[in-house]
Amino acid sequence: MKRENPNLFGALLLGLLLNTLLSSQTAYWARIGLLAYPLSAGLLISAALLFAWAWRGVERRRWLRFALGCLLGASSALEVLRFWRLLERVAPDSQNLLEVCLLLLLPVLYLRRVSAIAQTANVVLAALLIAGGLLILSIAGDLQVANLQPVPAHDRQWLQALRGQCLLYPEFLLPALWPDQEKRSPHTVIRLVGYSLAFSVGMHLILELYFGATMPEQEIPVHAAAQGGALSIFNRLEWLQLLLWAMLVSIKLALYLYAGIRLLGGRNSKTENTAVGLDRFPVYLLGMAFLCMLWRGIDLNRLFALRNLAAWLFAGLVLLMGGVQWLFAKRSSSV
């Protein structure tokens, strides 16, 4: 049964953790983020669960499936561009955009089958936890409680924290697409939201303890902290750190591709452990390369903000349509 329906929770969680690791800047102060955690978690859990409930009633509509597929495709291109921008800052002129596309997309050939995504995600998640432990050990001597900023909890700080936490990533919506009822349970969404927000708040706390008042000014703060730590492993083996992040992005791209194929195939996908056909991969590769070339000169922060707005609007539209359909069905059954 496991082979037919692999557990993709690890891949979903990796995709969410990646958003914090590759963030170009911190989003809020740790104390305000901790206070905003319950409200943000409640909003995201409610949105994801309501979307999953409404999606079951409207999933047959092809234009909705196509719209969600477009959202996943655009998100994939943004992930490639974000990693390319990171490489540009870390090692300028080291790789062009086409090379980065090939670096990230070619591993998706191996990750075409869902079982490969699940197994690879679990291995990479373990490696990420080890790397995180080494990072904390490396900068432990520079973590100072005095660096925590006494920021007053004004409306502006609250709004900044909520904007940084209430991001409706596609990973929160994808469990609604899985055929296995157990993987669509509320428990899955609650764990995803809880773990990802806790990781975000925890990383902001560590970075604030390390950088202090200069934390918002740091570019790619997680990488900057790793390079400034006491352990030389992050300097000498920087390529290994970048390779780990590249694998994270490739797993995320493979997950989005699998979800997109499920959307296009509708209910024809009988089992969850299906493989993306090789005949579709050239179209996918060319499409990603085209979008990346098209958007390479646009501000990524603006594109990610538009993606988040599109995700919230799409979830709201699905909820509205699902709610209307449920009301009509209830009225017709009572007549």
Question: Can you annotate each of these PLM segments?
Answer:
Residues N5-S24, A36-F51, L68-E79, L98-L102, ...:
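Hydrophobic, membrane-embedded alpha-helices of multi-pass small-molecule transporters
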Residues A11-G15, S23-W53, R307-G322, A329-V335:
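Extracellular loop-to-transmembrane helix junctions
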Residues L97, L109-I139, R307-L319:
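Membrane-interface loop-to-helix entry segments
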Residues A30-I32, S269-G277, F290-L313:
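Extracellular/periplasmic helix-loop-helix junctions in multi-pass membrane proteins
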Residues A27, R56-G57, R85-R89, L103-V123, ...:
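Membrane-water interface regions at transmembrane-helix termini and the short interhelical loops
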Residues Y210-E238:
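Membrane-interface interhelical connector segments
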Residues V80-S94, D180-F199, Y256-L286:
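Helix-loop-helix connectors at the membrane interface of multi-pass transporters/channels
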Residues R65-G73, V124-A140, Y195-H204, L285, ...:
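Small-residue-rich segments of transmembrane alpha-helices in multi-pass membrane proteins
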